[in-house]
Design a protein with these regions (language model features):
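Conserved acetyl-CoA-binding loop-helix of GNAT-fold acetyltransferases
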Residues: 95-98, 104-121, 140-144, 252-265
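Conserved N-terminal entry element of GNAT/NAT acetyltransferase domains
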Residues: 1-22, 159-178
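Conserved acetyl-CoA binding element of GNAT-fold acetyltransferases
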Residues: 89-101, 237-251
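Amide-forming acyltransferase catalytic core, primarily the GNAT-like/NAT-type
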Residues: 27, 124, 144-243
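Conserved active-site alpha-helix within GNAT-family acetyltransferase domains
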Residues: 105, 109, 121-126, 133-152, ...
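Conserved GNAT acetyl-CoA-binding A-motif
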Residues: 93, 119-134, 268-279
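Conserved beta-strand in the GNAT
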Residues: 68-70, 76-85, 92-97, 215, ...
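Active-site rim helix/loop that mediates acceptor-substrate recognition in acyltransferases
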Residues: 3-7, 29-83, 193-215
């Protein structure tokens, strides 16, 4: 007699295929079902993971390009997906998920290996992802595929508050000045971490009106920038939180000024607080946020593929959010 496991392993998912914008409802369903089941296994019964804002999905899909991959079942329904991103030599995966009824049959390994292969083929030198640190199953699963645990990423929030003067915003510049600002952001980033490039994310955020990039200058020279989203993360929610996706500060002494510029922008844009996802390697930045009144909200475990480690900025602070 066939068992449930026999039935699962007998099925074959077709993929990877490129993600289409019309796939967003299907992606949302798989995302919600998979992570709701993950919380249930962790003892958080009754938690239902909501759908993400379709505009955020569009950003993730267009940012990833051909790195956005889906696998389909016999009825063409989405049964798994992996969204692999690269920013110059920095590569990471997320979100990625498999429908609960398709798990335990090897599909999870297939989609992760596809993401690894795509990132390696696109000359990334960093291949990483994040997972919940309390979830031993996930950590063991990724470790079996060659990922090594790194430090925690800690999410902290600061309340929005007015500042003395608003920072310059990329979205309000002329087309020519935007080109110049992009070049400055690239130069600043690569002066701290060679090969990193957040130009595409800056331009896409502007094109989709999801947020903006703050440009902090001293005597006309760019000393910091912060790419952030103000659009709600969850479908149907109001604007509550400004999320910092990328942040580069030339010197730790300028970190607080950049944070205060973000707090001011949050107030001006109608959001209640600013969320920073701080990699554990930047302990001084973490301590500064706590001293400013930052509240710890969440933790994630950062993991990188063996042979593809994540570097720390040689000077200054470079924060890179590995979630959308």
């Amino acid at each position: 007699m066939a068992t449930a496991r026999d039935w699962k392993t007998a099925r074959h998912a077709d993929g990877p295929h490129p993600v289409r914008l019309s796939d967003i409802p299907g992606l949302n369903q798989v995302f919600s079902d998979a992570f709701t089941e993950r919380y249930r296994r962790d003892g958080m019964v009754g938690v239902r993971v909501p759908f993400l804002n379709p505009a955020i999905w569009r950003y993730a899909i267009e940012d990833a390009g051909s790195g956005a991959m889906v696998w389909r079942g016999e009825r063409e329904e989405i049964v798994a997906f992996n969204i692999a991103h690269r920013s110059g030599i920095e590569g990471w995966m997320g979100p990625l998920a498999v429908r609960p009824e398709w798990q335990s049959g090897g599909l999870g390994k297939e989609i992760v290996r596809a993401g690894i292969g795509w990132l390696a083929d696109h000359a990334t030198r960093v291949i990483g992802l994040e997972t919940m640190p309390r979830t031993m199953d996930n950590i063991g699963f990724y470790s079996g595929l060659g990922f090594l645990p790194s430090r925690l990423t800690i999410t902290l929030t600061l309340d929005a508050t007015g500042g003395d003067a608003p920072a310059q915003l990329y979205g309000r510049l002329s087309a020519r000045d935007k080109d110049d600002a992009l070049a400055e952001c690239l130069t600043l980033t690569q002066s701290m971490v060679a090969g990193y490039d957040y130009s595409r994310e800056i331009m896409l955020t502007d094109a989709l009106s999801l947020g903006d990039t703050l440009l902090v200058r001293e005597a006309g020279r760019l000393v910091a920038f912060a790419l952030c989203h103000t659009a709600p993360l969850v479908e149907g929610r109001t604007r509550e939180e400004l999320r910092v996706l990328k942040m580069a500060v030339s010197d730790p002494s300028r970190f607080e000024a950049c944070c205060r510029a973000l707090m001011d922008y949050a107030r001006r844009s109608g959001t209640r607080r600013v969320a920073f996802r701080v990699q554990g390697a930047y302990v001084d930045a973490y301590a500064r946020l706590v001293a400013m009144g930052g509240r710890v909200r969440w933790t994630d475990l950062r993991m990188t593929m063996a042979g593809y480690p994540e570097p720390q900025a040689e000077r200054g602070v470079v924060l890179s959010n590995w979630e959308i």
